[in-house]
Amino acid sequence: MCEYLSAVYEDVVKRNPGEPEFHQAVLEVLESLEPVLERHPEYKERGIIPMLLEPERIIKFRVPWLDDEGKIQVNRGFRVQFNSAIGPYKGGLRFHPSVYEGIIKFLGFEQIFKNSLTGLPIGGGKGGSDFDPKGKSDGEIMRFCQSYMTELYKYIGKDEDVPAGDIGVGAREIGYLYGQYKRITGLYEGVLTGKGIPYGGSLGRKQATGWGLCYFTDAMLRDRGLSFEGRTVVISGSGNVAIYAAEKAMSLGAKVVAMSDSNGYIHDPEGIDLATVKEIKEGKRGRISEYIKTRKNAEYTEGCRGIWSIPCDIALPCATQNEIDGESARALVKNGVTAVAEGANMPSTPEAIEVFLSAGVLFAPAKAANAGGVATSALEMTQNSQRLSWTLDEVDQKLHTIMTNIYENASRAAKEYGNDGNLVIGANIAGFIKVADAMMAQGAV
């Protein structure tokens, strides 16, 4: 990394202490940009990169709510409105005890590039709370969501900031949040995405991130004369992303042999019975360990790291950040993995990514590979603004086109800037240039 970019990174660390996830995300992007600055010194001269690294706005607020015992609990709420150069802020809400400002900044920063790559007019943002929905009653979750939106509504709008779901925020939570927004403002508008179909949601939104991940991976494989057909796949997670990635991988001819949740993982050498997983996770909201009650040849193992020791051709990490470390990456390479595509946000550590790239493994970074969710959210915004509802086939065709275009643009940028085949660098460059050009055109102040 050149002296200028090193100095920029050191300043980020100094100004944002105790936020390792944000530092990691920034470093990955900055390490990609040296060849861009050599060709476009105007980005340096106009101070584009330091501006891009500073959020336009950070909103932090308390969220008091009443539990079932009648006691008041207090959580912290966040919304980071990172960059609106190419459109209104767009990014999900995460409810999880690990949430703090640094994680929301990392996610919002990644969202800038991911949203840029879709080719759609959406900027980058992210929000959430350290509230833990696990173990809470439906009433408690409703009251928390209503309190959260009572503060957040002041800062969002269909043309300003459009949140969506993320970890801990599914259709139920979006419904409660949207209901409170409508109750307060009296406006029926596309201010949230991931809504239920009866009140303005889009068909295909639930499936979009997982399906899009497989469309991107398929484009990457086909560019090398490969495909999903006959391949063995390991997928971490068992939420929407993992379940619908498994569904699409199977429809493309692959055999998924392992999935996980936060407690442990299942290994079914005969192939995962996805209907059973859906019933456990979507129907009962249970633990994945229940899978082995009906699938006698399957095994359940406590803890999640071991899932990457299972031999596979394709690995799709769809659980959480930094779940694949260097050791797990080396185990995958040793067992002959051909491709790794990130369904979760930043699930591979920098060491793991280096292991994959050094071994010649096809590697699809999250900001490109999991952009299907936000792309379909933008399609939901379009339908809301036009007062239309598209069929599932229409949404799916648009999603397939968007994900294929993202792959082609990232691949082209990598080649153009001297890193052919490196989609990490290609995605960062392609996403950056569009946003940087928009910022240049609009002026610094």
What residue spans do the PLM features occupy?
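Predominant activation on well-ordered alpha-helical scaffold segments within soluble catalytic domains
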Residues: 9-10, 27, 34, 101, ...
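Rossmann-like adenosine-cofactor binding region
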Residues: 264-363, 368
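N-terminal ligand-binding/catalytic initiation module
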Residues: 1-203, 434-443
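Adenosine-phosphate binding glycine-rich loop
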Residues: 2-25, 220, 331-445
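General beta-strand structural signal in soluble alpha/beta enzymes
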Residues: 160-164, 187-192, 235, 258-261, ...
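Glycine-rich beta-alpha junction loops
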Residues: 81-82, 126-129, 168-169, 173, ...
